[in-house]
Amino acid sequence: MAGVSVKDVDAQQFINAYAAFLKRSGKMTTPQWIDIVKTGTHKELAPYDPDWYYVRAAAIARHIYLRKQVGVGRLCKVYGGSVNRGMRPSHHRDGSGSVQRKVVQSLEKIGVLEKSDNGGRRISQQGQRDLDRIAYSLLEDEE
């Protein structure tokens, strides 16, 4: 297991595996409003996937793992998108700050993330160990 990190596996496979792990573990609590909320002003509908909250949490955990520290504002920019304005030129709209904030708070509550002294969040030692363990299991399954 030494030397295996999240960078060594495919992003989509890792996100799906970690989302399944988060759902299976049952430690992460989801808000009641996740089935009706949009993920940003640029979206017209709520997500179709009933497990989208776990997938978003896994993607955010991977995103923060690959960087030193990330704030909620940066996550809003990452998960934003282009707004449909008809014939007019499209513009970027940030994703929902509430969704990103609640996901980060959920990950912080289960010990994957911790607050950084410089602002934002960073991956904790326990979180890094969990993510590396998932990455190692994916590499084992591949071989």
Curated annotation (Swiss-Prot):
Biological function: Component of the ribosome, a large ribonucleoprotein complex responsible for the synthesis of proteins in the cell. The small ribosomal subunit (SSU) binds messenger RNAs (mRNAs) and translates the encoded message by selecting cognate aminoacyl-transfer RNA (tRNA) molecules. The large subunit (LSU) contains the ribosomal catalytic site termed the peptidyl transferase center (PTC), which catalyzes the formation of peptide bonds, thereby polymerizing the amino acids delivered by tRNAs into a polypeptide chain.
GO biological process terms on file: cytoplasmic translation; ribosomal small subunit assembly
Lineage top rank: taxon: Eukaryota
Coiled coil in keyword set: no
SUBUNIT field: Component of the small ribosomal subunit (SSU). Mature yeast ribosomes consist of a small (40S) and a large (60S) subunit. The 40S small subunit contains 1 molecule of ribosomal RNA (18S rRNA) and at least 33 different proteins. The large 60S subunit contains 3 rRNA molecules (25S, 5.8S and 5S rRNA) and at least 46 different proteins.
Organism: Schizosaccharomyces pombe (strain 972 / ATCC 24843)
Organism classification: Eukaryota, Fungi, Dikarya, Ascomycota, Taphrinomycotina
Anything else known: There are 2 genes for eS19 in S.pombe.
Name used for this protein in its record: Small ribosomal subunit protein eS19B
Localization of this protein: Cytoplasm; Nucleus
InterPro entries documented for this protein: Ribosomal_eS19 (IPR001266), Ribosomal_eS19_CS (IPR018277), WH-like_DNA-bd_sf (IPR036388), WH_DNA-bd_sf (IPR036390)
Keyword Phosphoprotein: no
A molecular function GO annotation: structural constituent of ribosome
